[in-house]
Amino acid sequence: MHSPHADKGNALDTVAHKTLTRGWQAELDLRFTRAAHKTVLTSARHVGPLTVQRPFYPEDDVCHLYLLHPPGGIVGGDELTISATLATDSHALITQPGSGKFYRSRGPQAQLRQDFYLAPQATLEWLPQDTILFPGANANIQSVFHLAQESRLLAWDLLCLGRPVMQETFSHGTLRNRLEVWRDGTPLLIERLHLEGGSLHTVARHPWSGTLLCYPATEKMLDGVREQIAPLGDYAGATLIDSLLALRFLGHDNLLIQRVMRAVWQSLRPQLTQKPPLLPRIWQT
């Protein structure tokens, strides 16, 4: 497991760092612990334009947190690093008020690295809004979940290639997207998506691509998910391997995808956490 920092209490340290040649170098390090009857964000250290809003508690004990990406999106040369560590018995739900955006690059790569470290009995719901890849973007995204045997995870990774609402396809650009799940140092899932030169053959020319993860899951949960994703058609499926449920889809209709993904989350959450599916307030605005 990732060793916690030595500092204690609430920490919110900010240092802006941008260079003319490399863009933003931004970091965000979050630490969650269980204190008394609720999960507390004990440390939120950030460098550059990555930050969070003040935590709130619509269901008393779970820490709901909104992650704020750089204003105006991510451009070539930006390097963003996000790390979240959840101590034993903590439970955090992290989402975003808006879509992540990777804009057209004149050459330099934009990098986003996200690491999540869950102690035994820790629960993470990682539910960001979709990430939009503008035509001409050059993006390298890596998301890694480090679990213990008794951790609980409910997460998704939603990508929008181009701006289909504006009739813009991902006609040129590069995307390297890597998604990993490890349990006690053993890989449960390593998934790669590589798009080069605007070619969308890998995704059968669908502008929407995504994965939903649930751990630990059961055959009953898998059967329920397979029923719920039927409206997405032939380009959606779900598997259960080593207690990790992975739902994958390609699609054209963002409203249908959003509706199905939220319905799956609403179904899985009570089974995984014994808590009702309370929609994040920001989703309803």
Curated annotation (Swiss-Prot):
Belongs to the UreD family. Transmembrane segments: none annotated. Pfam families: UreD (PF01774). GO terms for molecular function: nickel cation binding. UreD, UreF and UreG form a complex that acts as a GTP-hydrolysis-dependent molecular chaperone, activating the urease apoprotein by helping to assemble the nickel containing metallocenter of UreC. The UreE protein probably delivers the nickel. The keyword Protease does not apply. It is found in: Cytoplasm. This is Urease accessory protein UreD. It comes from the Bacteria. Its main location: cytoplasm. Required for maturation of urease via the functional incorporation of the urease nickel metallocenter. InterPro entries: UreD. HAMAP family: UreD. Keywords: Chaperone, Cytoplasm, Nickel insertion. One of its GO terms (cellular component) is cytoplasm.
